[in-house]
Each structure stands twice: as C-alpha cells, then as structure tokens.
Curated annotation (Swiss-Prot):
It catalyses: ATP + H2O = ADP + phosphate + H(+). Its EC number is 3.6.4.13. Residues 423-584 form the Helicase C-terminal domain. A motif (DEAD box) lies at residues 356-359. Residues 56-73 have a biased composition (Low complexity). This is ATP-dependent RNA helicase DED1. ATP-binding RNA helicase involved in translation initiation. Remodels RNA in response to ADP and ATP concentrations by facilitating disruption, but also formation of RNA duplexes.
Length: 672
C-alpha cells in the first residue's frame, strides 16, 4: 500500500512538473526582444481558468445589441447570431443566412443585419458572393454578379448544352389556345416588365429565352391575378416556365409572405424546420431535379433560395441544403412526407402549390401522399393559397382531384391536349421481337450524326441488355432505370446531356418531364400499353419548337393501342402506314367498344364524349355517345360542382383584380 501511495504521489508530482514546464514554454523563449506570450494551458485544465481572463480575446464573439441582430456569424459560420428579444417580429421563413462557412449575417455588419420588422433588415444572401440577393427595407436588392455561377447556370452561347429556341419556334403562334373560366385575362405577347419583375427579366434574357410559349403567354397573367389554374399543354411547351415566371415575379416584387401562426408560435427562428412559401410536387427524382435546376437559374441573384428533396439520395445532404434556405421547394411526395414526419418541413406558410405531371403522380400511386400533403397537414386551405396543376393530359381522375384542390380555376388548353407536336416526324415500323436489334442498328445508322437518341424499353433488364448490345456493336450507349442508384442515374444523365454518350436506353422512369436539350431522335423499341405513355415518350424530342424524329417498333403484340395510335398520327398530320390500318381492322373483331386496352384509363380524343382536353365544367349535359374513354355519364354530374366561391380566400397576388368582379378575388388586398 505504501509503495502504491508513494507511486501515486510521485506520479502526481511528475504530472504537475510536466504541466508547469508546458505552461512556461513559448516559441519566443530565448529570442531577443520577444513579446511576452500567454502561458499554454492544456485542454483538460482550461475549464479551471477564470472567465475574466478571456474577456479581452472574446470581444469579437460577443453578441450584438438587439438593434444589430444577426449582424455577425456565430461560431459555426451559419450566419445566425444569438436570438434577440424581438425575434418574433423579425420573421424568418428559415435560415436564409450565409451558407456554411460564410461570414454570416443578413447584411454587412454596419447595417445592423436583420433587425426590427420585416421592412427593416436584410432578408436573403450572405456576406460572400454566393449568387443570392436580399429583401431589405421592403425592397428586393439583387446580389452581385458571380461569373462562375452564371456560367454554370446559363452556360455560354453555342455550347450546345442549353436549348432555348428552336427553328420552328415562331410556328407556336398558330397553335390554338382555349382558356375557359370567369374573367380570363388577356394573354401577354412578349417578355416585358411589367408583368414580369425586372430582375427576373434579366435572368430570362441570360437563359436566352426570347419569346414566351403559348402556355406562358396565358399562364403569366392568369397566375399574376391570383387565379388557380389547370394547364394542359403539349410536352416541351414551356410548362415549367409557365408557373415559375409568375410565381417568382410575385415573390421578387412583394417579398416574403408574413409568418404563419405556427411559425410565430415557435418565435420564427426554428432553424431545424423549413417554411417554404412555394411548393412544387412532381412524380420523379429526375423531374424535380430538373425543376430545381430551372429555379436556380431564375432565382439567380435574388432573395429566393430554391431547394430540392427526393427519395433515393442522402437525406442528410438534403437537410443541410434546406438549412441554408428553403423558400421554393421542389419535392417528390414520398420524401416530402418523410421530412414532414421528421419535423423538418412545415407547409403552414405555403402560398403557391404546384402539381406538375399530376396525372403521372396519380398513375404511380401517389394520391394518398398528395392528399395527406395538401389536406392532412398544416398547408393553408384551398381559399388561402394559389394552386396550379400542369400536365400534358388531364384524364377523369385528375379533373376530379381539381374539385378538391382548386377554387374557380381557369382551364387552359394549349394545342390538342394529349396529341403530339407536328415538329416531330413519326415513323411506325413493323418489326417482330427477334428482329428488333438488327433493325435498331439500321435505324441508328440512317439518322444524321450530332444529336442525341433516346431509346425506350419496357423492362429494366431489357434496358441493360440493349445497352450492352450497343456497346458490343461499338456504339456509345448508357442506360437508366429504377434499379440504378441515384448516383448512377445522375451520371448516366450527365454523360447523355453532354453528348459524351449519344444514346441512352431508358425505361418509363425517364419518360416524363425530362427536358434534355438536343434530343433529336426517340425510338420506342418496346411500345407502351397506353398511348398516353407513347405521347410522353416521343415528347422528349421536338421540344421548344425544335424538329425531332420518333421511330416505333410495332408488331401484333401491340394491337391494344393500334386505334389510338392511328388517331394520334392523323391528328399530328403524320403518315399512317396501310399495314397499320389493316391491323386496326383486324383488332376491331372481338374488341370491346367501351374502353381502351392496356390499363383501361382511356382518355378519349375528340368529340363530346371525351374531355381530356375539355373543361369539365362546360359539360353540363349528358355526354353524347358511349364510346372510348369515359364520356358516358360523367358530364352531367360534374358540370356545376367544380366551380365554387372564390371570394373568401386569398386575393389577387400581383395587381388589381378584373374590373368585372367588383373587387378582389379574396377577402384581403394581398397576402402581404
């Protein structure tokens, strides 16, 4: 025991002696004229130091006075200083401070940061040139130009990676447009300010968009007036810009909306929960990523911070992104529900709800999640938000959904809904399954070089097999399907977009919504069972007025869509092979007269019995005919019910309401 005690005492003395020596060490020891330095304190002894000894060195980390709240970054560099007593009055949708590692703050330190009421301090970008601006003193203050980011977002003229205007773009002026509803405003004809915010107009010019498409000509004034909208337009017609332009114009002009009650209850400073003011739902990872990329372009140098969340990717990375700012959120329904359950996103401050490719979301089984998001959480009701639904088709189930989600909307039909663009030259080849590979090689060899070719197949296994076959044939190809990891999918898309791999084999996962520039040829190696899917597949080419080619391999295994396919070809003024009409006559014997084959979700085309391209509210009488689609019996019950009162909720967003209304479209002059 004595030996052990002596040992402990010796060890204690030795430790103290070593610590004393460390404390007296200095890099200046022995140097002539060296200034005295503070003694080194080992980490385990630093807590024993008196706080007073740190006062002088901690001055730069002291919290600012309340009047200069958030003017300085905290120790993490997240741009948020200590909370001030007046925090609830200084609404913060989410952490809109500088990105991690920045100097922090809402403004330069001399201006007091984000202090006082909403029209006081800054609201938006950080101290470094991160491509964001601010909302300060009730005004939108664009950030400085960032050449590197600008090149990343908008590319350079002639780089081939950013398609904006095709050679047939002016023909869009001849496309018929039908807008039904009460007090539909006149369309715009050019990109001008007003109605488009001046800063957004600069970004549109950077994107080299010169003329609005038909859907944009109508959607911009409709959305500006605070109206709900159902927009039907052919693929590649500019639907994304059709809702982004008016939404961003309103946000740039009016600034962030006031905090919701839920936000105020938490003091407005809950950094762990995002409160987006705009929510865009889309069915696939690729589509929400594409929408987010467009949003990044048009929010460049603005106070609005876009974010994107989707399944199949690292959720921690996405959480970090929304922590840096989440004013405009693009999301897939499944991942959004996940983040809401985690308490990381609240929809209580949503003023704009956009459902893009709405019919495909329902086809993919997302209706329960969509209804939970819109009706089962804290999103404002239909009268207190503006809801926009965009898609290439609006079958019956979507029109029924509109009854619950939209208020006295404008129905916008641009061109023949569900039809294909005349810019696409369609060719149907009769090919037996065993001959498809050899015929594909002939088709690819006959096409001019320089463009991208997208080949659609029905199964994931076939996508990989066909891609391998092309590679063995010395043809550069890649594949994309649902079993690929998100990293693999993004890599394949990157190679395809850049032209390094000019051919991509895809399943339906890439069939909808993807806007890949310079796709000049689409091949339906396997025809889908529904003609709507065919429409969306070939819609990957001929976008924005450009000319495209579509080739389909047909055999008698595809008889279920032959009649709709013929009708589609005739609508687009395409050649109909005689053998295809012969197959159609064969299929008439023994075929039922009610619904289309395949999934049986037939939309019907033309005539009073179909309304995929018709406003259901105009169909008050019984439908004529009982043929394809679902014309029989639907019109009478739907006619008067989709409307409803429009006066109890939100007001006209971006200007005075139409004079014929006798007032605004809502109970208040604006959301602000």
């Amino acid at each position: 025991m004595t030996y052990e005690n002596n040992t402990h005492q010796q060890n204690g003395a030795g430790t103290a002696d070593i610590e004393s020596r460390f404390a007296n060490m200095s890099v200046q020891n022995g140097a002539a004229g060296g200034a005295p330095r503070k003694a080194y304190v080992p980490p385990h002894l630093r807590s024993q130091q008196q706080p007073a000894s740190l006062n002088s060195s901690a001055a730069s980390f002291s919290p600012r006075a309340p009047a200069a709240f958030n003017g300085n970054g905290n120790s993490n560099g997240n741009g948020n200083g200590p909370a001030a007593p007046a925090a609830p009055a200084a609404f913060q949708s989410f952490n809109r401070g500088a990105p991690r590692g920045g100097a922090g703050g809402w403004d330069a330190p001399s201006s007091g940061g984000y202090g006082g009421a909403r029209n006081g301090g800054g609201y938006g970008g950080g101290a470094r040139n991160d491509g964001f601006g601010q909302w300060k003193d009730g005004k939108h203050v664009p950030g400085p130009h960032n050449p590197r980011l600008q090149k990343e977002l908008f590319g350079e003229e002639g780089d081939g990676l950013h398609q904006s205007m095709g050679i047939n773009f002016d023909k869009y002026g001849d496309i018929p447009v039908e807008a039904t509803g009460r007090d539909v405003p006149e369309p715009v004809t050019t990109f001008t300010s007003p109605p488009i915010d001046a800063h957004l107009l600069e970004n549109i010019k950077l994107a080299r968009y010169t003329n609005p498409t038909p859907v944009q000509k109508y959607s911009i004034p409709i959305i500006k007036l605070g109206r709900d909208l159902m927009g039907c337009a052919q693929t590649g017609s500019g639907k994304t810009g059709g809702f982004l332009f008016p939404i961003l114009s309103a946000l740039f002009t009016h600034g962030p909306p006031p905090p919701s009650a839920a936000e105020m209850a938490q003091g407005g400073y809950n950094r762990r929960k995002a409160y987006p003011s705009t929510l865009i739902l889309a069915p696939t990872r690729e589509l929400v990523s594409q929408i987010h990329d467009e949003a990044r372009k048009f929010t460049y140098r603005s106070w609005v911070k876009p974010a994107v969340v989707y399944g199949g990717a690292d959720i921690v990375t996405q959480l970090r992104q929304i922590e840096r700012g989440c004013d405009l959120l693009s999301a897939t329904p499944g991942r959004l529900v996940d983040l809401m359950e985690r308490g990381r996103i609240s929809l209580s401050n949503v003023r704009f709800l956009v459902l893009d490719e709405a019919d495909r979301m329902l086809d993919m089984g997302f209706e329960p999640q969509i209804r939970r998001i819109v009706e089962g959480e804290d999103m404002p009701g239909v009268m207190d938000r503006q809801t926009l639904m965009f898609s290439a088709t609006f079958p019956r189930d979507i029109q029924l959904l509109a009854k619950d989600f939209l208020k006295e909307y404008v129905f916008l039909s641009v061109g023949r809904v569900g039809s294909t663009s005349e810019n696409i030259t369609q060719k149907i080849e009769y090919v037996e399954d065993d001959d498809k590979r050899s015929v594909l090689l002939d088709v690819l060899a006959s096409m001019p070089s320089g463009g991208l070719t997208l080949i659609f197949v029905e199964t994931k296994r076939m996508a990989d097999m066909l891609s391998d076959f092309l590679l063995r044939s010395k043809i550069g190809a890649t594949s994309i399907h649902g079993d690929r990891t998100q990293r693999e999918r993004e890599r394949a898309l990157e190679l395809f977009r850049s032209g390094k791999t000019p051919i991509m084999v895809a399943t339906a996962v890439a069939a909808r919504g993807l806007d890949i520039p310079n796709v000049t040829h689409v091949v339906n190696y396997d025809l889908p069972s529904d003609v709507d899917d065919y429409v969306h597949r070939i819609g990957r080419t001929g976008r924005a007025g450009n000319v495209g080619h579509a080739t389909a391999f047909f055999n008698r295994g595809n008889k279920n869509i032959v009649r709709d396919l013929i009708e589609l070809l005739k609508e687009a003024n395409q050649e109909v092979p005689q053998w295809l009409e012969a197959v159609a006559r064969e299929s008439m014997f023994g075929a039922g007269g009610g619904s289309r084959g395949g999934r049986g979700r037939g939309r019907g085309r033309g005539g009073a019995s179909s309304f995929g391209n018709r406003d259901a509210r105009t169909m008050n009488g019984p439908s004529s005919g009982g043929g394809r689609g679902f014309g029989g019996g639907y019109g009478g019950g739907m006619g008067g019910g989709l409307g409803g009162s429009y006066g109890a909720g939100a007001a006209a967003y971006g200007g005075p309401p139409p004079a014929s209304n006798g007032g605004s479209y809502g109970g208040n002059s604006s959301w602000w």
